[in-house]
């Protein structure tokens, strides 16, 4: 079967890999000049299987209001002038009940744990290097009230069987030795040993090469202008420079899935949530992180690659703009300099922003649409890297008409159309 994948980020390229593995003739198109040029370019680098949790949770509306008044807020809301922004926020607020949280959490954990297994199989199969590390996540708390608040998170970890260890301030240095220099700034910690890290862009670039070896064709600089269909069947996808026919189409366009598929009267509940990152060279390995550290106060993650440190986080609801305000850079620089002052060179740091495709219930859209041959693999929010291989394998199995290895019937767009 000929399958056309829309999007060459980690979701699209991973989908292409599993579709090719299943024996399909696969073509990938993207508007960028290469793979992983947008949301997958410089994310925080965390494979956060243990930290898979919905944004929409009980108590979040109150927390969000408090964050807005902080000097370095982890969440920022800027009206984009659209009614849709308000509608999306309202849908998210409706998911902030305990019942919805539990349903959404179960779905997300299911995908993330499956993705963990897919990464295990993939690495055993390919031996790919993407600067990955399996040394866990260390969440640090700067205030006693954060330590107390974490008890609710720990209860969730226990409910879903996620291994963890609570840490006293001085014990944090067991996992991140450089933090011994700043123990006085830490009130406690939480270590999740089963989490991992890796460079999403490097992974996607290497997977692109493996896909090519399997015969997958890539066409870049392709802006989609029109999708033609005959009844409930997609016939062709037209770009400004070409026309592509396929037996099946997979949409993995991240935030732009909504705008591209709007012409088909498909209403995808995806909103772009902007995030930021700094990438700086390691200057002193002993003063740099070993794995990934999540600063609970600032909602910022600091992740170690081979010779680089990635500092990423924050969430901004401001539409599709990707400006780089100096204030956000200052927040990232403040956090990494406060915890790892001797680790890297901020004067050589590169500053980046990207748009995460977030759904109101934080769960991605995977599977069928009302069109017989149009499938989705999009809307992963901040967990696109974590869920990438699991989501892609699910998508490939659904396209192929195979039984999926985990439940997938509640992941499709239909849950918003009931």
From Swiss-Prot:
Binding site for FAD: 3-17
EC number(s) from the headed UniProt entry: 1.4.99.-
Catalytic activity as recorded in UniProt: a D-alpha-amino acid + A + H2O = a 2-oxocarboxylate + AH2 + NH4(+)
Any one GO BP annotation for this protein: D-alanine catabolic process
Cofactor(s) required, per the database record: FAD
Keyword Transcription regulation carried by entry: no
Enzyme class of the recorded protein, top EC level: oxidoreductase
Entry GO CC: cytoplasm; plasma membrane
Keywords of the record: FAD, Flavoprotein, Oxidoreductase
InterPro entries (alphabetical): DadA, FAD-dep_OxRdtase, FAD/NAD-bd_sf
Any one GO molecular function term: D-amino-acid dehydrogenase activity
Function of the molecule: Oxidative deamination of D-amino acids.
Protein family membership: Belongs to the DadA oxidoreductase family.
Full protein name: D-amino acid dehydrogenase
Classification of source organism: Bacteria, Pseudomonadati, Pseudomonadota, Betaproteobacteria, Neisseriales
């Amino acid at each position: 079967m000929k399958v056309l994948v829309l999007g060459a980020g980690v979701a699209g390229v991973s989908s292409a890999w599993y579709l090719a593995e299943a024996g399909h003739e696969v073509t990938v198109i993207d508007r960028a000049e290469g793979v992983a040029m947008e949301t997958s370019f410089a994310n925080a680098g965390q494979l956060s299987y243990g930290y898979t949790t919905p944004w929409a949770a009980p108590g979040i509306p109150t927390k969000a209001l408090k964050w807005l008044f902080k000097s370095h807020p982890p969440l920022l809301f800027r009206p984009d002038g659209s009614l849709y922004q308000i509608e999306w926020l309202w849908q998210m607020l409706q998911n902030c009940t305990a019942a919805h949280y539990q349903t959404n959490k179960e779905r997300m954990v299911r995908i993330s744990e499956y993705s963990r297994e897919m990464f295990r199989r993939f690495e055993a199969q390919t031996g790919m290097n993407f600067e990955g590390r399996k040394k866990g996540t260390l969440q640090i708390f700067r205030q006693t009230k954060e330590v107390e608040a974490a008890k609710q998170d720990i209860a969730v970890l226990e409910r879903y069987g996620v291994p963890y260890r609570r840490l006293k301030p001085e014990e944090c240095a067991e996992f991140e030795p450089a933090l011994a220099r700043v123990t006085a700034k830490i009130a406690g910690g939480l270590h999740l040993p089963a989490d991992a890290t890796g460079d999403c862009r490097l992974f996607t670039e290497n997977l692109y090469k493996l896909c090519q070896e399997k015969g997958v064709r890539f066409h870049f600089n392709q802006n989609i202008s029109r999708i033609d269909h005959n009844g409930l069947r997609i016939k062709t996808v037209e770009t400004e420079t070409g026309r592509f026919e396929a037996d099946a189409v997979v949409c993995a366009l991240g935030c732009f899935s909504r705008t591209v598929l709007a012409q088909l009267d498909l209403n995808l509940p995806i909103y772009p949530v902007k995030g930021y990152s700094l990438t700086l060279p390691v200057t002193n390995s002993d003063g740099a992180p070993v794995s990934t550290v999540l600063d609970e106060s600032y909602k910022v993650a600091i992740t170690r690659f081979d010779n680089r440190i990635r500092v990423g986080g924050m969430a901004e609801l401001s539409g599709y703009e990707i400006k780089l305000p100096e204030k956000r850079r200052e927040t990232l620089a403040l956090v990494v300099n406060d915890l790892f002052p001797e680790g890297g060179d901020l004067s050589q740091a590169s500053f980046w922003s990207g748009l995460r495709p977030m759904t109101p219930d934080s769960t991605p859209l995977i599977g069928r649409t009302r069109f017989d041959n149009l499938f989705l693999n999009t809307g992963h929010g901040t967990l696109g890297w974590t869920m990438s291989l699991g989501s892609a394998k699910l998508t490939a199995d659904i396209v192929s008409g195979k039984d999926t290895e985990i439940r997938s019937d509640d992941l499709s767009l239909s849950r918003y159309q009931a």
